[in-house]
Amino acid sequence: MKSEVLSVKEKIGYGMGDAASHIIFDNVMLYMMFFYTDIFGIPAGFVGTMFLVARALDAISDPCMGLLADRTRSRWGKFRPWVLFGALPFGIVCVLAYSTPDLSMNGKMIYAAITYTLLTLLYTVVNIPYCALGGVITNDPTQRISLQSWRFVLATAGGMLSTVLMMPLVNLIGGDNKPLGFQGGIAVLSVVAFMMLAFCFFTTKERVEAPPTTTSMREDLRDIWQNDQWRIVGLLTIFNILAVCVRGGAMMYYVTWILGTPEVFVAFLTTYCVGNLIGSALAKPLTDWKCKVTIFWWTNALLAVISLAMFFVPMQASITMFVFIFVIGVLHQLVTPIQWVMMSDTVDYGEWCNGKRLTGISFAGTLFVLKLGLAFGGALIGWMLAYGGYDAAEKAQNSATISIIIALFTIVPAICYLLSAIIAKRYYSLTTHNLKTVMEQLAQGKRRCQQQFTSQEVQN
């Protein structure tokens, strides 16, 4: 395929798809645990276990969705139809998940389990084809960085729109009736997400074509697993999502019980999201200046240090915490576009190794491990709060619960970032130089053995 410069309209269109996903995803990650425990009245321990089971089941569906997308043939392409036609049921189920029918406790738990599981499955139907779409819009590494930078600027804006506006919408629609407010708030946001997904469908184009798949699903899964760089990115994905999931899920508890000022939650979250916007915008110029792998592991190392430092900040130092969360927002979102480009690069690497371009199943496999990280992260919050004796009805939490909330917000993310930095520096080999070699040889129809780069040092 001849490389071409993507239009700003198409970059915005592609980014709108992830903005829509983050309107729902960030909302669920930030508010759903709190919604279930404090609004719907379900025990935290059950919610943690439900998150683990539902997300694990959903993770299993990811490879199936990827294999299905890779085998899709339509006049709209392989991936775009799923983005459009999955959007409406996704929005409807999201509203149902935030509904609070008048049921017994057992009825509430069953209802929550069913609607939450459906929500995660429909997220898969839309999001796996969407993520794979980024790998077939262009195969130019520079354009991919630009596309992903636009994507995450808009994704951050979508997440910010959802998380910052959610509580004002809850208060506006429901007033003192918080269950009605949550249901109405997510309904408004779901309509916005649907329109964004439709815009994504109509403004993007699939350009990188792969020959029709003739191998079995089992062979495709085997080929993906044999891609050593895909396995590395999968591991990095687990640690990345654990960091953001645990910190995000603990944020409302942290502001409420540690900072002691729940009314500043929106301001605290907005500070983090503004940092995210800046970080997304910095990804392209920084990777133009330095190898993306170097930027990735250095940034993760810095995130680990800052997250650990937060643990020692006094509880009453609210202004200091605002500074910390802003810097973390910048740095975390700086590495996120880079990581998604690394995912696309492993698809090219896999084709270079074995002659098969498995875009759908590659992204599905990565999202599979992402969902496992989400499952464990969500469960960890619920289990740890239950272990500490968290009680939403109490006016003050015990010391064990306070310590657990602080650790979830600081220590756990620090460990995840540190492991990401070590793994990326030591094992990820698709540097700018090495990837250029892969792309040049792919253009010439050449192949190489998978181990060629494994002993090479990361080149700046």
Curated annotation (Swiss-Prot):
CDD domains referenced in this protein's UniProt entry, alphabetically: MFS_MelB_like (cd17332)
Molecular function, one GO term: symporter activity
Record InterPro entries: MFS_2, MFS_trans_sf, Na/Gal_symport, Na/Gal_symport_CS
Principal subcellular localization: membrane
Lineage: Bacteria, Pseudomonadati, Pseudomonadota, Gammaproteobacteria, Enterobacterales
Record's keyword terms, sorted: Cell inner membrane, Cell membrane, Membrane, Symport, Transmembrane, Transmembrane helix, Transport
Topological domain ranges for the Periplasmic compartment: 1-11, 54-80, 138-152, 203-248, 310, 388-403
Subcellular localization, as worded in the UniProt entry: Cell inner membrane
Keyword Cell membrane part of the UniProt annotation: yes
Matching Pfam families: MFS_2
Protein name according to UniProt: Inner membrane symporter YicJ
Membrane topology, as annotated: Multi-pass membrane protein
Cytoplasmic side: 102-116, 174-181, 270-288, 332-366, 425-460
Transmembrane portions of the chain: 12-32, 33-53, 81-101, 117-137, 153-173, 182-202, 249-269, 289-309, 311-331, 367-387, 404-424
Family designation: Belongs to the sodium:galactoside symporter (TC 2.A.2) family.
GO-annotated cellular components: plasma membrane
GO terms under biological process: carbohydrate transport; sodium ion transport; transmembrane transport
Gene assigned in the entry: yicJ
Keyword RNA-binding: no
